[in-house]
Amino acid sequence: MKTFTAKPETVKRDWFVVDAAGQTLGRLATEIASRLRGKHKPEYTPHVDTGDYIVVINAEQIRVTGAKTTDKIYYSHSGFPGGIKSINFEKLIAKAPERVIETAVKGMLPKNPLGRDMYRKLKVYAGAVHPHTAQQPLELKF
């Protein structure tokens, strides 16, 4: 019997909506990354994007454990000498709550063109409203 390999044109992708309110950042991000890769499907193939679309709502209500609200620091660099910037979790969640979840999930995906395609299927919104109701996303609980 031959080994099954998923073809990109035959992969069926579903839409799911995840409520991040009260969820722990790392635990939620690992589940989302696994779903984006398609590892929950029997037809998972490492070199084919078999994952689903994930819509995350209420990103502003995500929580972290311990003292990470003040101690967790996000870095960015402009590319120029001395151009490093840092912001802690507390300030970033107030400024751009979507970036917290996006950064956590992106770090758990492959660092190659396939990983970038997987990342594009992640949609994160700060509030409870999202523009993807036409896709009829199913609710996903972790």
Swiss-Prot record:
This is Large ribosomal subunit protein uL13. This protein is one of the early assembly proteins of the 50S ribosomal subunit, although it is not seen to bind rRNA by itself. It is important during the early stages of 50S assembly. PROSITE patterns: RIBOSOMAL_L13 (PS00783). Part of the 50S ribosomal subunit. NCBIfam families: rplM_bact. GO terms for biological process: negative regulation of translation; translation. GO terms for cellular component: cytosolic large ribosomal subunit.
